UniProtKB/Swiss-Prot annotation:
It comes from Rhizobium etli (strain ATCC 51251 / DSM 11541 / JCM 21823 / NBRC 15573 / CFN 42). Residues 30-59 are annotated as: NMP. Pfam families: ADK, ADK_lid. Monomer. Belongs to the adenylate kinase family. This is Adenylate kinase. GO terms for cellular component: cytoplasm.
């Protein structure tokens, strides 16, 4: 089960990825996490990435693909994985396809989360997380059962990301539509794309996702 979750920021990809992890036992792969792990582990590609970052430059697609490739070779990915927030561009999508093909692998499905822009801005504008465990909350949609106490770990410390506001969100959407939304057509043409209604209640979205996964 090799998945890509596609959709704009705030569409609910992270929430659904976590549910897939819990139910199916496959890892969620974030490029940021993989990059940090490779650098900390001192792998060959990690050293290359560190040199680039230390110089204050952006890590190239080639290095990112190499890090993803290295991570996919780990034993916990034997039964599949979820690519979260990657690929972001058509160039990265082509490189990912080629990398998987070289391993004799193929993507199982690309799940696209469809949500209106207005709703995305509303969601992100009220979002905050537990500083301890990262559980996501929202000012109106999802507040802790006990005010000021995380449902999952009991922490009383919460934080808001500086970029979780309407102005920044609108800019992030512009980047998404310019760079990432072309992937919708790309994967549709390959017969891999499966859309879900990201406007629905979280449990309903999960049901739609599971219906897709049950057919793999």
């Amino acid at each position: 089960m090799r998945l890509i979750l596609l959709g704009p920021p705030g569409a609910g990809k992270g929430t659904q990825a976590q549910r897939i992890v819990e139910k199916h036992g496959i890892p969620q792969l974030s490029t940021g996490d993989m990059l940090r792990a490779a650098v900390n582990a001192g792998t060959e590609v990690g050293k290359r990435a560190k040199a680039v970052m230390d110089a204050g430059k952006l890590v190239s697609d080639e290095i990112v693909i190499a890090i993803v490739s290295e991570r996919i070779d780990q034993p916990d990915c034997a039964n599949g994985f979820i690519l979260d927030g990657f690929p972001r561009t058509l160039v990265q999508a082509d490189a990912t396809e080629a990398m998987l093909k070289a391993k004799g692998l193929d993507l199982s499905v690309v799940i696209e989360f469809r949500v209106d822009d207005e709703e995305l801005v509303r969601r992100v504008d009220g979002r905050y997380t537990c500083a301890q465990c990262g559980t996501v909350y929202h000012d109106t949609d999802k507040v802790p059962v006990e005010e000021g106490v995380c449902d999952k770990c009991g922490s009383t410390h919460f934080k808001r990301r500086p970029d979780d506001n309407a102005e920044t969100m609108i800019k992030r959407l512009e980047v998404y539509y310019k760079e990432t939304s072309p992937l919708i057509g790309y994967y549709h043409a390959k017969g891999k794309l499966r859309p879900v209604d990201g406007m629905a209640e979280i449990d309903q979205v999960t049901a739609e996702v599971e219906a897709i996964l049950s057919k793999l």
